[in-house]
């Protein structure tokens, strides 16, 4: 028990250190390591190395001395006690363990020193590699700086030469050496000089084990002794700086940025504080950029690659030959068409417009001024054209003589009305056209081609002889090669004969005189020849050069002589044309046909017209869908001097207008739109001139001096509409003005009735009819629709209106319609039509008109009206009946019979 207590008490005296010695060494070594990253970044890391606390080896004789002393004390002292054997054994065991521990630690220390030596060698190799790279970067940067300096000097000299100061340096420009503040090599108080970069790059293992070496202030040195460049000395702030300039500066981060304000720390600075702030630089160093941060090689490589690509692109642009085009600009043009004409992308054109403040799409139209700015932006030349320039070059090129081939002659038959022009053509064509003409007079231009027994071909154009058809005769003369002047042997020279002579002379066409009706009693051909002398027509029998032939269309005599005379005249003219070119010609007649649309009779004068060609005829255009000859047969192409009917035009072209084949639809549309715009402007200008000024109109209204008769003309063909318009306008009186609202072709529609109602006009229908809806609307609105088939009646009625006879004595009253469903041949009676009354009533003895495709083909009286076998006075709607017409048997299934009666209207 006492032994255990003694051991417990002796624990406090056991120690591995000699008595009276204290361990004052530090157990922790601290330092800093700068880690480098990519793109020139770095970071300072604090490193601590802890040492284990342990006593050193005991000095020799310390144990024996202490024990001896103890023993001496024990022996000599009154209170001393000798060690027991167990205590002595314990102490010996502890000492042996301490010696073994010391040996083990010595071995570990030697191993650590070996590792440190190897790490130092590795760090030395890495340091050498970094030094080599830094030297290469420094040389490269110096070369780039020198190159930039040379470029700037060259630019400065060029600008000086441009301003007339070549060879004289600018005094206001500072010298390159004085571009920044001069840094003296004399040490500045409060600043320290960093060791060279190689000194600062200490081995990683060395800085991890050994404490960081504080940066000490450099000793004063003369400039000659320590020459340093301004960029190699960095002034570091150590401690407090008393200068006012430094007081005004904000605190900076190691990278040069402004650090946020921090409260002053109350702890005393540690010993290694200066080394922790060794990476912070002042404002001057931040401005000059003299820190350890540099651009990475990858960044420099990318920059050089970009510069190389940019230089290559600039070289290619400089070497590229820019194409400058002549861009034709009309009055209006779409963005898409403008881009096509400049051979540029549509997106680039839209971008250029956006820069000008114009937001446009590819289909939007631009005016000529805006388009001109865009073209100039792209560097092209601008050529402005007028709207009429779209017609330039439409006629084609001149034909070469070797390309011309013989063609048939075009013969126009002209003369006075009822002198037998159409009958003469029928005799030549062996047809019967004259019987179908209303009133026995021709009211359309007919074009035919006759093949003679000899194989030769002659193209005939039949023109009306009535006074109202002057324009038609003029058109016929303008396209003809030879004029056949038909003069009746019994009538002699008449007014329209004289007019035909004038038209032929104006067209510079040779004349062949055909003296017709020589078989009639009282015919005197010599008198005709004598009368022609007064109009400078001298026939061959009287010593002149004009051929004359006596013919009889009824007896068909003298026709062969007329054909020989025509061929002889054509041979003398040597008529030729080039069939291998685009077709050109004239529109002889045009009409609006139900079921086929607009139909134009054209005469091909040059080239060959083929099915599928794009044609511009007057103000209309279209693609030829079908072609018909004079006998109604479909053909694929038409040679020069051949008359044909063409289908596929968008509208009804004007009679006498030229037609031409163009390359594409865009050109055709442009020409058509321009011509339609010209027609609208001309019409508007004429109406404005006719109305006069507002003061003049008010004066006429107040005085009541001028009245107006408005008419709306609808005809079956364009030529008839023009003739009616000319006839009506000639009937003007000084107190009554005749105004034609419109003159068109086709049936009467509701829009025509509404226009006539608004203008209080009379609708004149020439060989056409109104639709059911238009007729009902006219009855409700009280619009007067008058139907005619002979132009004389139109002139008489309009003349009565002008003279103040507002209504004629007799007026037509509509009764009803009947549809022919079956045609029967009855002996001794003729043809009888089995009809079904579709509207109104049919009365016996009423007037009838036979309609075929809404065109009047016969007008007469109803001779018989039967229901089954009984004669009846009238048949109402919804019943069947039998009809027969007086003196007419050309009845067909599907024809419509219009019934009317004349009633007396009081004036």
UniProtKB/Swiss-Prot annotation:
Q: What's the superkingdom here?
A: Bacteria
Segments of skewed composition (Low complexity) = 211-230
Query: Do you know which SUPFAM superfamilies this protein is assigned to?
Result: Initiation factor IF2/eIF5b, domain 3 (SSF52156), P-loop containing nucleoside triphosphate hydrolases (SSF52540), Translation proteins (SSF50447)
Q: What is its main location?
A: cytoplasm
- Keyword terms: Cytoplasm, GTP-binding, Initiation factor, Nucleotide-binding, Protein biosynthesis
Q: Where is this region: G3?
A: 462-465
Residues annotated as binding GTP? 415-422, 462-466, 516-519
Q: Segment Disordered: which positions? A: 1-305
Which InterPro entries does the UniProt record give? Answer: EF-G-like_DII, EFTu-like_2, IF2_assoc_dom_bac, IF2_II, IF2_N, P-loop_NTPase, Small_GTP-bd, T_Tr_GTP-bd_dom
Q: From start to end residue, where is composition biased (Gly residues)?
A: 62-80
Cellular compartment(s):
Cytoplasm
Q: Where is this region: G2?
A: 440-444
Question: What positions does the domain tr-type G occupy?
Answer: 406-576
Q: Show the ranges annotated as biased composition (Basic and acidic residues).
A: 93-114, 122-158, 240-249, 271-280
Chain positions covered by the region annotation G1: 415-422
Which Gene Ontology terms cover its molecular function? GTP binding; GTPase activity; guanosine tetraphosphate binding; translation initiation factor activity
What ranges does the record give for the region G5, renumbered to this chain?
552-554
Ranges where the record places region G4: 516-519
Name the GO cellular-component terms: cytosol
Which cysteines pair up through disulfides? They are none
Q: Which PANTHER family match?
A: TR-TYPE G DOMAIN-CONTAINING PROTEIN (PTHR43381:SF5), TRANSLATION INITIATION FACTOR IF-2-RELATED (PTHR43381)
Do you know which NCBIfam families this protein is assigned to?
IF-2 (TIGR00487), small_GTP (TIGR00231)
Q: What does this protein do?
A: One of the essential components for the initiation of protein synthesis. Protects formylmethionyl-tRNA from spontaneous hydrolysis and promotes its binding to the 30S ribosomal subunits. Also involved in the hydrolysis of GTP during the formation of the 70S ribosomal complex.
Instruction: Spell out the protein name for this chain.
Output: Translation initiation factor IF-2
Native organism: Gluconacetobacter diazotrophicus (strain ATCC 49037 / DSM 5601 / CCUG 37298 / CIP 103539 / LMG 7603 / PAl5)
**Lineage start:** Bacteria, Pseudomonadati, Pseudomonadota, Alphaproteobacteria, Acetobacterales
């Amino acid at each position: 028990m006492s032994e255990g207590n003694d051991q417990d008490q002796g624990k406090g005296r056991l120690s591995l250190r000699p008595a009276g010695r204290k361990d004052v060494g530090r157990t922790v070594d601290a330092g800093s390591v700068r880690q480098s990253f990519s793109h020139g970044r770095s970071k300072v890391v604090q490193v601590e190395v802890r040492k284990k606390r342990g006593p050193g080896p005991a000095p020799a004789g310390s144990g024996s001395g202490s024990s001896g002393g103890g023993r001496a004390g024990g022996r000599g002292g009154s209170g001393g006690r000798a060690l027991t054997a167990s205590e002595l054994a314990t102490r010996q065991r502890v000492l042996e363990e301490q010696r073994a521990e010391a040996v083990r630690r010595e071995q570990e220390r030697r191993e650590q020193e070996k590792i440190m030596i190897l790490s130092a060698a590795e760090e030395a190799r890495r340091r050498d590699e970094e030094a080599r790279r830094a030297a290469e970067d420094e040389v490269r940067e110096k070369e780039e700086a020198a190159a930039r300096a040379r470029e700037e000097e060259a630019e400065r000299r060029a600008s000086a030469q441009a301003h007339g100061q070549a060879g004289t340096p600018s005094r206001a420009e500072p010298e390159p050496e004085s571009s920044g503040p001069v840094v003296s090599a004399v040490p500045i108080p409060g600043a320290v000089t960093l060791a060279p970069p190689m000194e600062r790059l200490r081995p990683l293992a060395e800085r991890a084990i050994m404490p960081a070496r504080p940066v000490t202030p450099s000793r004063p040195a003369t400039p000659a002794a320590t020459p340093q460049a301004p960029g190699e000395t960095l002034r570091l702030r150590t401690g407090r700086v008393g200068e006012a300039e430094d007081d005004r500066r904000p605190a900076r981060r190691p990278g040069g940025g402004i650090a946020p304000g921090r409260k002053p720390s109350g702890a005393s600075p540690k010993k290694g504080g200066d080394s922790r702030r060794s990476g912070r630089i002042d404002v001057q160093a931040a401005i000059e950029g003299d820190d350890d941060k540099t651009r990475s090689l990858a960044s420099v490589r990318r920059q050089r690659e970009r510069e190389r690509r940019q230089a290559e692109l600039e070289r290619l642009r400089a070497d590229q030959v820019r194409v400058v085009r002549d861009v034709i600009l009309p009055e209006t043009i779409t963005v898409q068409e403008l881009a096509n004409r400049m051979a540029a992308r549509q997106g680039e054109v839209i971008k250029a417009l956006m820069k000008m403040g114009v937001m446009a799409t590819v289909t939007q139209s631009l005016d000529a001024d805006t388009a001109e700015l865009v073209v100039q932006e792209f560097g092209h030349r601008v050529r402005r054209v007028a709207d009429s320039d779209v017609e330039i070059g439409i006629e084609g090129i001149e034909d070469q003589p070797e390309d011309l081939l013989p063609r048939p002659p075009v013969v126009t038959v002209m003369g006075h009305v009822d002198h037998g022009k159409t009958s003469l053509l029928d005799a030549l064509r062996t047809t019967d056209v004259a019987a179908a003409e209303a009133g026995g007079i021709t009211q359309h231009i007919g074009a035919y081609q006759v093949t003679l027994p000899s194989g030769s071909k002659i193209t005939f154009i039949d023109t009306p002889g009535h006074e109202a058809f002057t324009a038609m005769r003029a058109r016929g003369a303008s396209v003809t090669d030879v004029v056949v002047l038909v003069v009746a042997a019994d009538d002699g020279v008449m007014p329209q004969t004289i007019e035909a002579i004038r038209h032929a002379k104006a067209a510079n066409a040779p004349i062949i005189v055909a003296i017709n009706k020589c078989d009639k009693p009282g015919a005197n051909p010599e008198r005709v020849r004598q009368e022609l002398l007064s109009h400078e027509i001298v026939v061959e029998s009287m010593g002149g050069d004009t051929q004359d032939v006596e013919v009889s269309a009824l007896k068909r005599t003298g026709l062969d002589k007329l054909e020989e005379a025509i061929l002889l005249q054509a041979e003398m003219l040597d008529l030729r044309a080039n069939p291998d070119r685009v077709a050109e010609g004239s529109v002889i007649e045009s009409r609006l046909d139900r079921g086929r649309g607009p139909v134009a009779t054209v005469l091909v004068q040059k080239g060959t017209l083929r099915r599928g060609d794009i044609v511009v005829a007057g103000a209309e255009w279209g693609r030829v869908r079908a072609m018909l000859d004079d006998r109604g047969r479909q053909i694929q192409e038409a040679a020069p001097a051949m008359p044909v009917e063409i289908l596929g035009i968008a509208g009804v072209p004007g009679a006498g207008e030229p037609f031409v084949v163009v390359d594409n639809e865009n050109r055709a549309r442009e020409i058509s739109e321009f011509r339609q715009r010209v027609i609208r402007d001309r019409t508007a200008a004429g109406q404005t001139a006719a109305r006069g000024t507002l003061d003049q109109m008010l004066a006429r209204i107040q005085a009541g001096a001028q009245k107006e008769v408005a008419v709306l003309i609808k005809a079956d063909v364009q030529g008839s509409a023009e003739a009616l318009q000319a006839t009506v306008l000639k009937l003007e009186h000084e107190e009554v003005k005749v105004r034609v609202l419109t003159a068109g072709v086709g049936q009467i529609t509701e829009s025509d009735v509404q226009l006539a109602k608004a203008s209080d006009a009379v609708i004149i229908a020439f060989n056409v009819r109104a639709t059911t809806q238009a007729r009902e609307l006219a009855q409700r609105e009280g619009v007067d629709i008058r139907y005619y088939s002979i132009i004389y009646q139109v002139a008489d009625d309009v003349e009565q209106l002008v003279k103040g006879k507002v209504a004629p004595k007799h007026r037509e009253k509509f009764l009803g319609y009947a549809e022919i469903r079956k045609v029967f041949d009855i002996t001794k009676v003729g043809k009888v039509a089995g009809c079904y009354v579709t509207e109104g009533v049919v009365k016996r003895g009423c007037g009838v008109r036979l309609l075929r495709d809404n065109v009047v083909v016969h007008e007469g009286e109803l001779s018989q009206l039967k229901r089954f076998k009984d004669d009846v006075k009238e048949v109402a709607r919804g019943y069947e009946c039998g009809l027969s017409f007086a003196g007419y048997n050309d009845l067909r299934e599907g024809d419509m019979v219009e019934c009317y009666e004349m009633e007396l209207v009081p004036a």
